[in-house]
Regions:
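Long, repeat-rich segments with strong aromatic
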Residues: 234-270, 274, 292-294, 301
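Short, well-structured alpha-helical segments that form the helix of a local strand-helix-strand
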Residues: 127-136, 267-280
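Second-shell loop/turn segments in exported
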Residues: 102-103, 112-121
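Substrate-recognition/cap regions that form aromatic- and gly/pro-loop-enriched pockets
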Residues: 279-407
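Secondary-structure boundary elements
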Residues: 120-129, 133-142, 263, 305-308
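Sec-dependent N-terminal signal peptides
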Residues: 4-15
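A contiguous strand-loop segment
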Residues: 21-110, 130-255
């Protein structure tokens, strides 16, 4: 891991800079021994308020970078999700920290972190190294964030703090990790390079700021030392974490970083969890549910080590609220996306104009496909008995999709 960190440092020195918007999201990683089919499963709900417009592109490979599927929200620096040709997948959750200083070089980095993972990482472990290198070289300029990264063999959580401090933990193969918008990494052992990585002064810096007092606090706990207290006590964060824990573990009180689920996790389970919405459940407790009014994309990454990357790695996308949209598979081997799914003809143009072409999206692109999905959300949120029947019918259709898909895979692989 240390060698990989060093090898990426020079490459990262030429990267550009950008600014942050932190909104609610939710993510899950299930290790390959915890899943029904032996895949690593990573799931993510992207939640962003305001006028959002999803575009989907396939960025071609170059001599220096990999091919990747890119789910883009114009103008957003912390919202896009990616899966590259090796199945390396990345998404993130805003996790506010208590850091009020933060050492930055050249203005720090933000959006470039996820794009660099998509372009250069051939494994999740390399993705961890890239993120760590960027944070240590430039500094992270947001308050705090946890990147979730996975490949067909393992998944990781990489938590960064404003400035140059970071830590990463591997999700055990037989366990499931869930994360709302607060840090979930607790006790850290940087000597265990198989399961942890991070900056060397992580503990010493916390001591120097008075965030960790060894004589009274016991073992060092990253989340307790670095997290914003408001994020840890947020009703929405706690509610979404409880909902996931209740589903996977049969309990509502979040415990360790990850735990063994009460049964093997399937693709369908991930769809169910991302779709938990109080409109359907009738749950009136305080705080946002996992699926909520700000959910603009739900993605599930099914990463199977026993099939070649092109067919074995699939990004399942529900374009909007997953409680009322169907998940559609995107294979890692595709070389281009349907033309109507992007506002530009090429991914290269979209990349060049990601920040500059981000205002008045509905006005400038009135015929964009995404607005039809947004209209469907509004229509589907009528809590009438008739509308609930529509939900049931859509769910039944979606329930059959993984069965047909798995039958196809078994036939040819």
């Amino acid at each position: 891991m240390k060698k990989i960190l060093f090898s990426f440092a020079l490459l990262l020195c030429c990267l550009g800079l950008a600014a942050a918007q932190d909104y609610n999201c939710f993510s899950v990683i299930a290790g390959r021994s915890a899943t029904v089919d032996g895949s690593v499963l990573m799931a993510h709900n992207e939640d962003d308020p305001g006028e959002q417009m999803l575009n989907i592109y396939v960025m071609p490979a170059t001599d220096k970078s990999l091919r990747y599927i890119w789910c883009e929200f114009p103008g957003m620096e912390v919202s896009d999700v990616f899966m590259n040709q090796f199945g390396v997948s990345v998404a993130s959750n805003g996790c506010p920290s208590r850091e009020d200083k933060g050492d930055l070089s050249g203005g720090g980095v933000l959006y470039e972190i996820r794009t660099s993972v998509a372009k250069y990482a051939r494994t999740a472990r390399e993705a961890v190294a890239i993120i760590g290198s960027m944070v240590e070289v430039f500094g992270y300029k947001g308050s705090g964030r946890s990147y979730i990264v996975a490949d067909p063999t393992e998944g990781w959580v990489v938590s960064v703090v404003k400035g140059k401090h970071w830590v990463a933990q591997r999700v055990p193969d037989d366990q499931v990790m869930t994360i709302p918008n607060y840090y979930v990494i607790g006790e850290v052992d940087l000597d265990d390079e198989e399961n942890f990585a991070g900056c060397q002064d992580l503990v010493d810096y916390a001591i120097s700021r008075g965030w960790y007092k060894p004589e009274t606090d016991g073992s060092f706990n990253f989340a307790k030392a670095y997290a914003s207290e408001k994020s840890l006590t947020s009703a929405s964060n706690q509610r979404r974490h409880r909902e996931a824990w209740n589903y996977f573990f049969g309990m509502e009180r979040p415990g360790e970083f990850a735990s063994i689920p009460r049964k093997k996790v399937s693709l369908r389970d991930m769809m169910n969890v991302l779709s938990i919405h109080d409109v359907l459940t009738g749950d009136s407790r305080i705080g946002h549910s996992i699926c909520n009014d700000n959910t603009v994309l739900a993605s599930i990454f099914q990463l199977r080590p026993w099939i070649e990357f092109d067919m074995g790695c699939v990004m399942w996308n529900a374009m909007g609220h997953p409680c009322c949209q169907t998940f559609v598979p995107w294979y890692a081997g595709i070389t281009e996306a349907p033309a109507n799914l992007g506002r530009f003809k090429t991914a290269q143009e979209a990349e060049a104009k990601h920040m500059s072409d981000a205002k008045d999206k509905h006005k400038n692109y009135p015929d964009h496909f995404y607005w039809k999905y947004a209209d469907n959300w509004d229509a589907s949120y009528d809590p009438s008995a008739e509308q609930r029947e529509i939900f049931k019918a859509r769910r039944q259709f979606e329930k059959e999709t993984p069965k047909d898909y798995n039958a196809f895979i078994r036939k040819f692989y």
